[in-house]
Design a protein with these regions (language model features):
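Mixed-charge (Asp/Glu-Lys/Arg
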Residues: 1-168
Length: 168
């Protein structure tokens, strides 16, 4: 059995998983994150912002902040630019005084989206960052974050526990 999004039932749970992933980042010894503040958009139209995160990072001299606008797309098909229409991403980033925009996908973005993000990264006069995680990338990150398994992937968690118990 492998970790898969099959256990995630809908877009709200996918957003919750994404938010919890960022909340749990501060507990990881593999980074210099000292605090993470997560703000979900709530029910209704979100205008392209599902989650707003503010991360405090220490470089051993000073703590600095990074703010990201995150949009989650829990769809079976690839995410195309039509799924992002009606959102002026640079304006959205600016309106939240953020550093960048992260698109988290269940599947993957189309070449149109990846090319759009490449152009925005190269030519954005405000030097905002435009990133995406496809489903495989996000699953790899989640796999390392065992604190999320029991809540969001109970079948996978039970499978792993049964293997661990057999080894005892």
């Amino acid at each position: 059995m492998t970790l898969a999004f099959d256990e995630i039932q809908d877009d709200k749970i996918f957003e919750d998983l994404t938010a919890e992933y960022f909340r749990d980042l501060k507990d990881s010894p593999d980074n210099n994150i000292t605090n993470v503040e997560v703000k979900a958009s709530g029910e209704g139209s979100d205008g392209g912002r599902d989650i707003l995160i503010e991360i405090d990072i220490s470089d051993d001299i000073k703590v600095f902040k990074r703010k990201w606008v995150i949009q989650c797309k829990f769809r079976e098909d690839s995410i195309s630019t039509t799924h992002l229409k009606g959102i002026n991403i640079p304006t959205l980033i600016h309106s939240y005084n953020a550093h960048g925009y992260l698109l988290v996908c269940k599947t993957r973005p189309t070449s149109g989206v990846t090319e759009l993000f490449e152009r925005l990264n190269e030519k954005c006069k405000d030097q905002y960052q435009y990133e995406y995680w496809n489903g495989t990338q996000f699953l790899k990150k989640i796999l390392l974050m065992e604190s999320l398994h029991q809540t969001f992937f109970p079948k996978y968690f039970n499978y792993v526990q049964s293997i661990k118990n057999k080894k005892k």
